Amino acid sequence: AGGAVRWDENDKAAGWEREIGVTADGDAAKEEQAYKAAMLLEVINLTIPGVPCIYQGDEYGEAGANDPDNRHMMKFNGLTERQQQFRNEVQQLVQMRRNSLPLIYGEYIPVEVADNKWVFDRTYMGETVRVTIDLANLAYSIN
């Protein structure tokens, strides 16, 4: 998400040749954008129908690519401040899903699908949760 691996390069070779980070150049603004994009993926993962899958490191925004760079050691300690913020936000999303019958069992009802916006409802037993994904601003809302 942060551009550490270019679309036109061999991602497998890149993983062998250098360490893949969140961004290629360590630019703080690009890194923040990458974390926001990754968070949108977690929001989608935790609000669409089905069983969410949080894979090794997803909960704190672990960077990676294809083999051999897709299996970093799991961090249980020593997270950066931004990784800890990301982890806390994912924990809040998981807790919200656990406490929301519409997000667990609800029917998926698309409301708006556009180039940079996706709005859908999850409805169960008269209760509705609305999820808005805003790609243009890398933002979301869950009501």
What are the residue ranges of the model-derived segments?
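Active-site and adjacent substrate-binding regions of carbohydrate-active enzymes
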Residues: 1-143
